[in-house]
């Protein structure tokens, strides 16, 4: 299983494009990518989930922790283009209010 995290800059803020699977073997790559971007204290970091093919509960938990970490640094972490599966997982877990999701 693999995850590719590509960072680009846009008018909206820093965008981290994820492609592949987010699970216990790849969450560290996501964590490192987001923490590296938070170092510069941007107003917003967007995590683009449009090419994410799988996410398990550890992946969702990592996104929740990273959202809290970003908020503590006054950065908004936005999850963009989630799949229906990801949205269902968020709903079942009851964590939608803790995440900022953009379509």
Model-derived features with residue positions:
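STAS-like cytosolic regulatory interaction modules
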Residues: 1-54, 65-103
């Amino acid at each position: 299983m693999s995850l590719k995290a590509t960072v680009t800059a846009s008018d909206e803020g820093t965008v981290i494009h994820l492609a592949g699977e987010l699970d216990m073997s790849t969450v560290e790559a996501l964590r490192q990518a987001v923490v590296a971007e938070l170092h510069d204290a941007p107003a917003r970091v967007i995590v683009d989930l449009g090419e994410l093919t799988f996410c398990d509960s550890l992946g969702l938990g990592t996104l929740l922790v990273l959202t809290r970490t970003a908020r503590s640094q006054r950065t908004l972490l936005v999850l963009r283009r989630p799949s229906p599966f990801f949205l269902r997982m968020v709903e079942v877990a009851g964590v939608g209010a803790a995440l900022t999701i953009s379509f």
